[in-house]
Amino acid sequence: MRFKELIFPLRVEEEELVEKFYEEGFFNFAIEEDEKGKRVLKIYLREGEPLPDFLKDWEIVDEKITTPKDWIVELEPFEIVEGIFIDPTEKINRRDAIVIKLSPGVAFGTGLHPTTRMSVFFLKKYLKEGNTVLDVGCGTGILAIAAKKLGASQVVAVDVDEQAVEVAEENVRKNDVDVLVKWSDLLSDVEGTFDIVVSNILAEIHVKLLEDVNRVTHRDSMLILSGIVDKKEDMVKRKASEHGWNVLERKQEREWVTLVMKRS
């Protein structure tokens, strides 16, 4: 499958507008730095797919035809947190570390973003052998795969984007782990309870998630909520408090915040 890659300049004040892409159901984008260190927005469209209306007023600075394979080649193996490596190239062969093999496809989440890194950090810190884990908004499946390789007994990964589900399923097969990947609009198709719920999505979506998360957790469960812009942190905390959750630990990189929560 071939894609058209469109590159747009991105000012700091425009980054919050990118959050609206999720609300429009558009997931095939990434925020990166160009060779001059300037932030740019990369959009990926299937050949023949029209530019979404909400992007028609944005200035395009570059355009090319590409494939998912091209993006994988650009990524080199890296250590996302101590002892856990992301390997898009299958170059790493180590027995003294956790290695996550990755075929990014076009779903968000290669492990380069601070929100993914902080989520993996807290999974490594808090996940106990035999825990059950639910990954809501799984994207490429990095967090679900990490959870299984860290010792979780059962891992379920869900996403509302069908393409993300396909990419996550491919990555699960590539890593030869037992993870159930399925479509679900947040928790709509999720059954059972879990020791840890991890979710790397937008603050507004966390607010919706918190309205139903008690159904899939128990008194000793833990939430790891990432993808929160710092100025929206209080909004998430207020909603969490309404449903009986308090912040156990907080981590921030740049403007991005990750919260670990326990029942009060």
Swiss-Prot record:
It comes from the Bacteria. InterPro entries: Ribosomal_L11_MeTrfase_PrmA (IPR050078), Ribosomal_PrmA_MeTrfase (IPR004498), SAM-dependent_MTases_sf (IPR029063). S-adenosyl-L-methionine binds at residues 116, 137, 159, 200. It comes from Thermotoga sp. (strain RQ2). One of its GO terms (molecular function) is protein-lysine N-methyltransferase activity. It is found in: Cytoplasm. Keywords: Cytoplasm, Methyltransferase, S-adenosyl-L-methionine, Transferase. Methylates ribosomal protein L11. This is Ribosomal protein L11 methyltransferase. One of its GO terms (biological process) is methylation. The keyword Transcription does not apply.
